[in-house]
Amino acid sequence: MKFDTMLAIGIGGFIGAILRAYTAGLVNSAVKHDIPFGTLSVNLIGSLLLGMFIGAIQYGGIQNPYIKSMLTTGMMGAFTTFSTFAVESFFLFKNALYIQALSYILLNVIGCIILAGAGFKGIEAILK
C-alpha cells in the first residue's frame, strides 16, 4: 500500500475516532439503559453512511481513490466498532442480562445490515 493511501486512511481514522467518541458519549449521557446505546448508535449510523459511501463509489459519485480510502476504511472503520460490540455483548451475558444481550446483538446485526442496504439503495436511486 502506498504511503499517501495510508495517510488518507489515517486522516479518515482520526476523524472517525473523534466522531465515534463524541457520538457514543452523547448518546450514553442521554440514554441510561442496560443496553449500550452509544455503541449501537455509532454502528447503525456508520453502517448507513458506509452503504451510502459504497453506493457513491460504485455509481461514480466518489472517484478519487484517496477520498474512497479515507471515507470507507479510515473514517467508517474508526467510527464503527465490532470489538466494543463484542465485549459489551459478552458483559451483558456475564451479568445475566440475557434479554438485553440478545436484543443488543439482534439490533446491531440486523439493524446494521438493513441500514447499510438502505444507504446503498438510497444513493443508487439518486446516482444510477
Curated annotation (Swiss-Prot):
Belongs to the fluoride channel Fluc/FEX (TC 1.A.43) family. It is found in: Cell inner membrane. This is Fluoride-specific ion channel FluC. Na(+) is not transported, but it plays an essential structural role and its presence is essential for fluoride channel function. One of its GO terms (cellular component) is plasma membrane. It catalyses: fluoride(in) = fluoride(out). It comes from the Bacteria. The keyword ATP-binding does not apply. One of its GO terms (molecular function) is fluoride channel activity. Fluoride-specific ion channel. Important for reducing fluoride concentration in the cell, thus reducing its toxicity. The chain crosses the membrane at residues 7-27, 37-57, 73-93, 96-116. Its main location: membrane. Na(+) binds at G77, T80. The gene is fluC. It is a multi-pass membrane protein. One of its GO terms (biological process) is cellular detoxification of fluoride. Keywords: Cell inner membrane, Cell membrane, Ion channel, Ion transport, Membrane, Metal-binding, Sodium, Transmembrane, Transmembrane helix, Transport.
